[in-house]
Amino acid sequence: MWAEGLGGLERFCSPGKGRGLRALEPFQVGDLLFSCPAYAYVLTVNERGNHCEYCFCMCCFFNNVFQSSQKEDWPMHKLECSPMVVFGENWNPSETVRLTARILAKQKIHPERTPSEKLLAVKEFESHLDKLDNEKKDLIQSDIAALHHFYSKHLEFPDNDSLVVLFAQVNCNGFTIEDEELSHLGSAIFPDVALMNHSCCPNVIVTYKGTLAEVRAVQEISPGEEVFTSYIDLLYPTEDRNDRLRDSYFFTCECQECTTKDKDKAKVEIRKLSDPPKAEAIRDMVRYARNVIEEFRRAKHYKYILYNAPPSELLEICELSQEKMSSVFEDSNVYMLHMMYQAMGVCLYMQDWEGALQYGQKIIKPYSKHYPLYSLNVASMWLKLGRLYMGLEHKAAGEKALKKAIAIMEVAHGKDHPYISEIKQEIESH
């Protein structure tokens, strides 16, 4: 085991969960439990030209720091630069393939244990191979084929079975790095962060400072308590959350939130009508909502809709689905909120600031009710609202919203995080 360990924390065997992380000392809300540099990471293709590929910073991309960053990242930069030149416009490996290529390169360059692996090594990651269905196995084989296709001249590969294990490990243990508005920046592996088990009422939150993951308490944690993070978006009711957990992580959550289902009624709130909808009508509408959400998720993933339909048609789909669901669901129902959030995103893309603001105003109150107290989803919504208000010359409302975002982010990100300094500057500059 890595000699340093993590101060105030220990790896232990969590009953019914396997490996876990446990506190050895008390932590207060906002305390930094530990930080973990990325073992391997990759900037998403869409952010090239906006962020430094070495540190994910925006500012160093536009000044002299970029040259030193590029020098530091040269071994990984070279891994992609040469094949990009060779393949040109045909260079299109998935982010998972790119990340896995970097892991293989890192293992060759740095075979010994790294500072990212103080309590958990990459080779110890769970793969859940025995739980993969044929569809997931086929996807992994497609990724392996892409890895060979794009990187065969620049990497040495282990045998196919070893690559299957590695891709399965990356799928279960990879992290998405997001900015202050929860926009996707890239993907990474943080071994010690991956040691934490999941709960739908987590006591810590993971945020990022460039390619460094930071874990802070969002509840008081006593010595002997297990440290829990959340692997998923907590907006949805128990059944939906566990469907996602089973599909991606191969377990069913048994936390207090999932056992009591206390918030489910409010999350799937039904309209109060003189002639209340029947149980069958409610079930049908829930089924419709889940199907619409899944269709949108797939469309966004494959970019099908963006290539085949203008944004106005996307917005129409959002509006029609809301109209249909509103015959049964209240506006505070999470399925309604999901489609409102999608609509807000389309409005932002179309630069329809008034439309985006109207959706954000509808979303923020139920978000604050459904999500935990220190939620990044709530903070990012306040942040978007604040920036919209400021842009539309509603300074007082904008300042109020931005300060609400800061109050959450000071706990989740830490008071010294660059994002918070930037938001404070936004307030001062108006």
Show where each model-derived region lies.
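Short alpha-helical interaction motifs and adjacent low-complexity tails used for partner binding
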Residues: 1-64, 68-430
